A protein has these predicted regions:
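A residue-level marker of the well-folded mature domains of exported/periplasmic proteins
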Residues: 1-181
Length: 181
């Protein structure tokens, strides 16, 4: 689920799709997996503020056999997460922050969240400015994965190890997402 199809929402989708398509080489995603995407048709004034639309799209995806919903798009994505939580046996992944804390209604399905670690980025930029080394242009900060919370015991150690390996590879550049802005 995505709040809008504007360029800043595309990198996550493209990177995820790239990794999913490499399933035959080195990932634990099933070869029979399928990626389905829904983007809000409205402009930026509604794309990120429409939880009903997000819930409706999540229900549509679940009715078509989806077993994991990645609910991005602000309140629109939150609607998708909450709808997913109402469906036993379907999982969800949050975005931007640890949505375990911000969307508690999603906890029954919320495995983790892909987080933008804004606080360390702001700290880094302020520190650079204080030192007189404020960078011009775009700043790319840290990202991370939220804790597994209640799902922690259900995530096998080998999956956690593979996630750590992938995280390391993404950070050191040995794994490419396939996305080049």
């Amino acid at each position: 689920m995505g709040g809008g199809a504007e360029p800043k929402s595309r990198p996550s989708r493209l990177a995820f799709h790239h990794r999913q398509c490499l399933h035959e080489t080195e990932t634990f995603v099933s070869k029979d997996s399928c990626l389905t995407e829904y983007y809000h048709p409205g402009g930026l004034d509604t794309a990120f503020t429409d939880p009903k639309w997000g819930a409706d799209q999540a229900k549509l995806a679940i009715d078509q056999g989806a077993d994991v919903i990645f609910g991005a798009g602000g309140k629109t994505g939150n609607g998708a997460l909450i709808e997913t939580a109402a469906n036993k046996g379907v999982y969800c992944i949050g975005v931007d922050t640890d949505q375990w804390e911000t969307v508690p209604e999603a906890r029954p399905c919320l495995i983790s969240s892909a987080m933008k670690l804004i606080t360390p980025g702001v700290f880094d930029l302020i520190s650079k400015a204080k030192e007189g080394n404020f960078p011009s242009g775009n700043y790319v900060g840290e990202v991370g994965l939220a804790p597994f919370h209640d799902f922690d015991a259900q995530i096998p150690a080998e999956v956690k190890a593979k996630i750590a390996e992938i995280d390391k590879g993404l950070r050191d550049g040995s794994i490419s997402t396939g996305y080049n802005p």
